[in-house]
Amino acid sequence: MADFVKLSIFGTVFEVTTRYVDLQPVGMGAFGLVCSANDQLTSTSVAIKKIMKPFSTPVLSKRTYRELKLLKHIRHENIISLSDIFISPLEDIYFVTELLGTDLHRLLTSRPLEKQFIQYFLYQILRGLKYVHSAGVVHRDLKPSNILVNENCDLKICDFGLARIQDPQMTGYVSTRYYRAPEIMLTWQKYDVAVDVWSAGCIFAEMLEGKPLFPGKDHVNQFSIITELLGTPPDEVIKTICSENTLRFVQSLPKRERVPFSQKFKNADPMALDLLEKMLVFDPRTRISAAEALAHPYLAPYHDPTDEPEAEEAFDWSFNDADLPVDTWKVMMYSEILDFHNIDNSGQDEGPVPPVNN
């Protein structure tokens, strides 16, 4: 059994193994607190994310299990990687990942980005998306604060807690409004990997302009702002709307013409706008894919088809429709953690695996 130390950070108890020292708070999310720390075993800086009460409800247990499975499966230079995971004596779960110095949200609020940085950041976002999409995974909550950057401008996508299987009948969810694809608001249940490309397009526009492109106050205002730039949705999109209330709302909006992107983004590179227009398309069926976007001339300085890998195998989503009690999720989680550490059930684990109360 590993030794643990208990700390209070922002009024939250952090229980970590003695391997990690010098903890400092770096961020607080809806589902956990993140601290930086020094890993004495590897002499590197790491980020430690505490999952708050992972076994409090079946929904939260499943969400935590999903994120753990994804982090174990996804191995790519532009996706955050898991270096350690452990369960504390209080049965909280801690994910340990590499530490990057900042995120895109902080960069965008501090200063305008130069052209070469915009290109390089967009290239890396799309390179990461190509990989996860090839594994049958949709991130679903891509936004600047979920895109980490280090001092070398290396970029990694993080926070896969909302990620889901690529499925044409996806269930509705709550993501960050500014970056939400219109098909989520219009059809709610029918969307796929194209939603991430829309989000990446919104982030691309924000890098070009230095401010959010579609800062809606609520979902109605959000959709209205989108139509101010893209015009009224085409008939092919309106036909996909299942909800009568949504259909009435869309039909009640004034008819709007598309605004030329060169008029909206007066100082932008024409090649950048050509790619942006292909990413911000109302109809997800005609929206450019991440793989196609990588080959666009705007990204030619970085594009290398021999170094833009796809996943070797699709992610196993067989657990995703399971409606299981907390104790079952707990056992499954312990099994995944043991597997991560390459320890079988008869071995001696370095971290605690508390008994499950049946």
UniProtKB/Swiss-Prot annotation:
Family matches, as InterPro entries: Kinase-like_dom_sf (IPR011009), MAP_kinase (IPR050117), MAP_kinase_CS (IPR003527), MAPK_p38-like (IPR008352), MAPK_Sty1/Hog1 (IPR038783), Prot_kinase_dom (IPR000719), Protein_kinase_ATP_BS (IPR017441), Ser/Thr_kinase_AS (IPR008271)
Residues bearing PTM Phosphotyrosine: Y173
GO cellular component, one term: cytoplasm
Residues reported to bind ATP: V26, G27, M28, G29, A30, F31, G32, L33, V34, K49
Chief location: cytoplasm
Cofactor(s) required, per the database record: Mg(2+)
Residues forming the catalytic site: D141 (proton acceptor)
Catalytic activity: L-seryl-[protein] + ATP = O-phospho-L-seryl-[protein] + ADP + H(+); L-threonyl-[protein] + ATP = O-phospho-L-threonyl-[protein] + ADP + H(+)
Positions bearing Phosphothreonine: T171
Motif (TXY): 171-173
Pfam assignment, any one: Pkinase
EC class of the enzyme, as a word: transferase
Name of the protein: Mitogen-activated protein kinase HOG1
Species: Mycosarcoma maydis (Corn smut fungus)
